[in-house]
Amino acid sequence: MSRRIEIVEVGPRDGLQNEKAVLEAPDKIEFIKRLEAAGARRIEAVSFVNPRRVPQMAGAEEIMAALPREAGRSRIGLVLNERGWDRAVASACDEANVVVCATDGFGIRNQGAGVAEQVAALETIVKKRELEGGPPISLTVSVAFGCPFEGEVSQDQVTAIVRAAAALGVGEIALADTIGVADPWTVRKRIEAARVAAPDARLRMHFHDTRGTGLANAFASVEAGVDVLDASCGGLGGCPFAPAATGNIATEDLVYMLERAGFETGLDAGALVEAGRWIGERIGKPPVSALSRAGGFP
């Protein structure tokens, strides 16, 4: 039996958050349904952030209410603080993904808080869940390979956050190349260090293809033993607080690469291409994935 790689679809959240064309909730709901029809089982569907700061993420509660609970499907809500956690719990999210930035410079611009304050917020959320219940919590360490404001990010900066999350019992930890500056060699080193810092946590990796290294970084992660990768249908993506950051690795391109190499993903690359074209028509931007241009093979 071939090894299975789980792909977390982040198009409805990370993919859309930086688009100028603000979509209404019904279009976002339809996009999620199309992705699920293509085989996506874990989808970062919404973000519980202030809609005044990120208008594209408005309507999170409406979207969650419109998605029927289904066994085997997980709709993830992004959370930055206790207020976001409370909204995620009230909306019956299947998972909450808490983000902690690896640098103060990015954290203050993106979340209005430095690293120490963000880690404290994570601790508050974890303890609140222990007392009151709520969905499983994962952590994403953003700008884990480089920061648009502070430049290089050291391995020690990243592993300090990973170690803190592990001490709190966070079960899944992701390292995110938010601005697309990572390379496969550094990726392997960060994975090794994260495993030492959090030996019991499941690792997930999140790459952008800003400088053309996204798929190489994803494959390096798989070779290093990582079984969970984020990707965005159509290669949508960016960050409103990260200048020049462009799209995530395209889900359909990642599926093509992995399945050609003999891995299982459970996703239909052709259906993903069509979903990418559908959402592209609504935001006025064609998908940037290679598969949407060249098609699959054979």
Go through the PLM ranges and name each one:
Residues M1-P298:
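Catalytic cores and adjacent flexible loops of soluble metabolic enzymes
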